């Protein structure tokens, strides 16, 4: 039997956490704010969660105008993975300069504490590839769905997660075909993306 792992998800409530625990689906559960991390810590105390929920946290670019990255550092020290962090010029109104500063502070901290990073790159694929080239680490580019920057990330030995849209979106299928098989992971980003 094949064991599936969800490489990136946001778990919104106890019901979603219990579904994953009951089904035995290992999940990298990401928290993008201090409040989300509190919820994730609560879910981590559910019976069976320690073998299923893999916590990750970092200041998500959508919230980089509400918190400083340093407010997440003590939380980042508690988890095995940093993320999701990055930049977004498609779904986010936070000025890119502020997003960039938050990203660079978190990348520096991730390097200092030697933890891998999950990246959010929407609309900023080339810029983020340029930035991370200065912070050698292990990176997962989450829900990678475009060909912009693919070669840059491959040169940096990054991993990629692809979402459910690979099942019906020809553009995502084309990108997935260009990725090395040993660099592709699957993700839901949360059950809302699957429903």
Language model segments and positions:
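Mid-domain alpha/beta scaffold segments of enzyme catalytic cores
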Residues: 1-195
């Amino acid at each position: 039997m094949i064991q599936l792992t969800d490489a990136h998800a946001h778990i919104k409530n106890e019901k979603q956490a219990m579904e994953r625990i009951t089904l035995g689906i290992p999940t990298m559960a990401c928290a993008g704010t201090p409040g989300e991390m509190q919820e994730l810590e609560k879910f981590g105390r559910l019976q069976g969660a320690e073998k299923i929920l893999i916590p990750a946290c970092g200041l998500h670019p959508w919230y980089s105008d509400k918190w400083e990255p340093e407010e997440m550092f003590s939380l980042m020290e508690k988890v095995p993975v940093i993320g999701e962090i990055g930049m977004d010029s498609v779904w986010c109104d936070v000025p890119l300069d502020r997003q960039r500063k938050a990203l660079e502070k978190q990348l520096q901290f991730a390097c200092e504490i030697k933890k891998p990073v999950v990246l959010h790159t929407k609309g900023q694929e080339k810029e983020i590839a340029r930035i991370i080239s200065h912070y050698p680490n292990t990176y997962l580019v989450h829900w990678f769905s475009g060909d912009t920057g693919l070669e840059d990330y491959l040169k940096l030995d990054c991993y990629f997660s692809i979402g459910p849209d690979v099942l019906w979106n020809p553009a995502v299928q084309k990108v997935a075909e260009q990725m090395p098989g040993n660099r592709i992971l699957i993700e839901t980003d949360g059950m809302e993306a699957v429903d």
